[in-house]
């Protein structure tokens, strides 16, 4: 713990806490201040001036990052018949029906994405208490309730991320790994920012993005100048 604290202090010394960095500077600093001994995840966090209690100010969706996330998602698909075969052919890791529901209810959660055909949602709905809090419940807004299961599986395997504003109006998302070239991280960052900017509710008032930070696993938060994106 003492060693970790020392490493964090050393990382913080490289950051000017009063400054909001350009995206290029912030990405470079995130890589430089990372002290994890593994390929750390790089994340961004947007603090948005929205009221998520209002239906028209809820922000949720999905996108495929230009350079992926650096992680191959484990994809589970609820489908039957031809659609089940389509999911398997597209590379889904797990495909099933009631058997998967029983397995998940028994505590199995070794997957990252859940996709379902519309006709399976009555069955999947039984897992709401398990999947909902983990942000794994299939949803049409994120493209995970669909008849085009092949496309959904391929996108999930190819770097698709989902995002959702929490109760405080904060949206967090993975934009890659520390091992990524700085240019690729910056491009992923800019692509995600474009999506967030386009998602601004028409009824939102005042400054939309009140703060923006980038960080790595275990690393310090670095303020980003949203105007640089």
From Swiss-Prot:
| Gene3D superfamilies in UniProt | 3.30.190.20, 3.40.50.790
Please state which protein family the record places this protein in: Belongs to the universal ribosomal protein uL1 family.
Instruction: Extract the SUPFAM superfamilies matched here.
Output: Ribosomal protein L1 (SSF56808)
Q: What does this protein do?
A: Binds directly to 23S rRNA. The L1 stalk is quite mobile in the ribosome, and is involved in E site tRNA release.
Task: Spell out the subunit comment.
Answer: Part of the 50S ribosomal subunit.
Q: What is this protein called?
A: Large ribosomal subunit protein uL1
Which of UniProt's keywords are assigned here?
Answer: Repressor, Ribonucleoprotein, Ribosomal protein, RNA-binding, rRNA-binding, Translation regulation, tRNA-binding
On whether Repressor is a keyword of this UniProt record, the answer is yes
For the biological process aspect of GO, one term held by this record is:
translation
- At the top level, the lineage of the source is Bacteria
One of the entry's Gene Ontology molecular-function terms is: rRNA binding
Q: Does the keyword Iron-sulfur apply?
A: no
InterPro entries the record matches: Ribosom_uL1_bac-type, Ribosomal_uL1, Ribosomal_uL1-like, Ribosomal_uL1/biogenesis, Ribosomal_uL1_3-a/b-sand, Ribosomal_uL1_CS
Q: Which GO terms describe its cellular component?
A: large ribosomal subunit
* One protein family per Pfam: Ribosomal_L1
Identify the species of origin. Answer: Streptococcus gordonii (strain Challis / ATCC 35105 / BCRC 15272 / CH1 / DL1 / V288)
């Amino acid at each position: 713990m003492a060693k970790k604290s020392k490493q964090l202090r050393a990382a913080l010394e490289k950051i000017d806490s009063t400054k909001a960095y350009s995206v290029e500077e912030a990405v470079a600093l995130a890589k430089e201040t990372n002290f994890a001994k593994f390929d750390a995840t790089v994340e961004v966090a947007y603090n948005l001036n929205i009221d998520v209690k209002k239906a028209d100010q809820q922000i949720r969706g999905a996108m495929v990052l230009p350079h992926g996330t650096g992680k191959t998602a484990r994809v589970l698909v609820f489908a039957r018949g031809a659609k089940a075969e389509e999911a398997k052919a597209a590379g889904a890791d797990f495909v099933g029906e009631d058997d998967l529901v029983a397995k998940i209810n028994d505590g199995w959660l070794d997957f990252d994405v859940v996709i379902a055909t519309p006709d399976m949602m009555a069955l999947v709905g039984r897992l709401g208490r398990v999947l909902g809090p983990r942000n794994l419940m299939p949803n049409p807004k994120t493209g995970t309730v669909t008849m085009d299961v092949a496309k959904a599986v391929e996108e999930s395997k190819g770097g698709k991320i989902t995002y959702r504003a929490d109760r405080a109006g904060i949206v967090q998302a993975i934009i890659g790994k520390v091992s990524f070239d700085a240019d690729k991280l910056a491009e992923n960052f800019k692509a995600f920012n474009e999506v967030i900017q386009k998602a601004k509710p028409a009824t939102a008032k005042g400054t939309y993005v009140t703060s923006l930070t980038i960080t790595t696993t275990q690393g310090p938060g670095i303020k980003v100048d949203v105007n640089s994106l």
